[in-house]
Amino acid sequence: MTMLNGLRILDTLPLAALEVGKHWYWEIGNLKLHGQVFMASWVVIALLIIASLLATRNIQRVPSGMQNFMEYVLEFLRDLARTQLGEKHYRPWLPFIGTLFLFIFVSNWSGSLIPWRLIEIPEGELAAPTNDINTTVALALLTSLAYFYAGLSKKGLGYFANYVQPIPVLLPIKILEDFTKPLSLSFRLFGNILADELVVAVLVFLVPLFVPLPLMALGLFTSAIQALVFATLAGAYIHEAIESEEEEEHA
């Protein structure tokens, strides 16, 4: 009886609720678009454009301030692309890999540094763009299109010969691999960012002052790592598509 009375008392207490998965849809004809994802993505793109304009508005021979920081970022991205693609192939793909990294990095950090939930919208709530599976799948599909394009532009139709090398029995496995690559990229990024934001949101709700701060710092670190992993794997997949047999033997 004592236990039953205790359960009845618990039933009368208000429960904390944290809703996820609600979306504000924009209807364009027969299409339904996730409005809050577009809004958050535009904010991230605007931040990147503003940073670029600030860094290039007064270019100096001896860089300082914002220009110095942006040159460091560009040097980091160049080294990242060159490491994955090699000296011979990295230049045409540097803009793609650099854009991937910067968009994902700023999106991930915006989830911790921008108070999205304070901005009211008709339905759902704003969050980091990479907190939505649609964004991460779109980025992964872009990566898939990039390495297919890289392989076809480098080898022509001979690119498809890779599917039956070294033995034809590997054909089903290599076709399956083309589906698992974007899936693994998208779900890894989505799962890490969503989990980080949910943990911080719950702790802020329960203990709203100092306890969430270390987790927020850890979240910033893991968010940067996720951006690096995504860009690194994208470069590795593109290099795999364009690498010739002679280069493999030389390596």
UniProtKB/Swiss-Prot annotation:
Gene3D superfamilies: ATP synthase, F0 complex, subunit A. InterPro entries: ATP_syn_F0_a_bact/chloroplast, ATP_synth_F0_asu, ATP_synth_F0_asu_AS, F0_ATP_A_sf. The chain crosses the membrane at residues 35-55, 94-114, 133-153, 198-218, 219-239. Its main location: membrane. GO terms for cellular component: plasma membrane-derived thylakoid membrane; proton-transporting ATP synthase complex. It is found in: Cellular thylakoid membrane. The keyword Phosphoprotein does not apply. One of its GO terms (molecular function) is proton-transporting ATP synthase activity, rotational mechanism. The keyword Isomerase does not apply. PROSITE patterns: ATPASE_A. It is a multi-pass membrane protein. CDD domains: ATP-synt_Fo_a_6. F-type ATPases have 2 components, CF(1) - the catalytic core - and CF(0) - the membrane proton channel. CF(1) has five subunits: alpha(3), beta(3), gamma(1), delta(1), epsilon(1). CF(0) has four main subunits: a, b, b' and c. Key component of the proton channel; it plays a direct role in the translocation of protons across the membrane. Belongs to the ATPase A chain family. This is ATP synthase subunit a 2. It comes from Crocosphaera subtropica (strain ATCC 51142 / BH68). The lineage of its organism: Bacteria, Bacillati, Cyanobacteriota, Cyanophyceae, Oscillatoriophycideae.
